[in-house]
Amino acid sequence: MRQLPMTPPPGWRMELFEVIPHLLIGTRLASGTDYATLGVDVIVDLEDWEWAWVPTVPIGKVYLSFPMADEDEVDPKTRDVAHFIASLIGSGRTVLVHCTEGLNRSGVVAARALMVMGRTATDAISLVRHRRGLTMDGFPALGNEAFVEWLLSEEAGSDANRRAP
């Protein structure tokens, strides 16, 4: 696991990627980011508490922190956060989900939200990977295969539940 500094390095460029209309994933917010310029109603911050930087939140906008460690295992709250994001999008809100690099934690939460909204796991994974693209270092979104396997198992589990009498 890479250790990143508490604040972004000088010249840090925050990046946002539209996965579908009303759902964006992104990298760590740059210090001093003006929430109003992001074009979103809700920011869902998945960074560890020690890394989080909270922007000034204008009236009518929402900032939510669901800290998730940058580890190889899927955080237990991922499913609940994804359902919440899907409900926000369903109510017409535009949501930005971000972690440090906008790859794995943001990717698994966004993909699971897409599944809640009716996409297959394979489609959700492909869409997140395609829309996020590679980092400058060549890392893909959802490069953590444990996260991909979890998403596929979530679909298999929900399919089994639908078929149960």
Regions found by a protein language model. Give the residues of each.
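Histidine/acidic residue-rich metal-binding segments in metalloenzymes
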Residues: 155
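Short intrinsically disordered terminal tails
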Residues: 1, 160-165
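A phosphate-binding catalytic loop at a beta-strand-loop-alpha-helix junction
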Residues: 92-111, 115
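Cysteine-based protein phosphatase catalytic domain of the PTP/DSP
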Residues: 8-94, 115-150
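N-terminal glycine-/charge-rich "phosphate-binding" loop or analogous flexible N-terminal tail
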Residues: 1-9
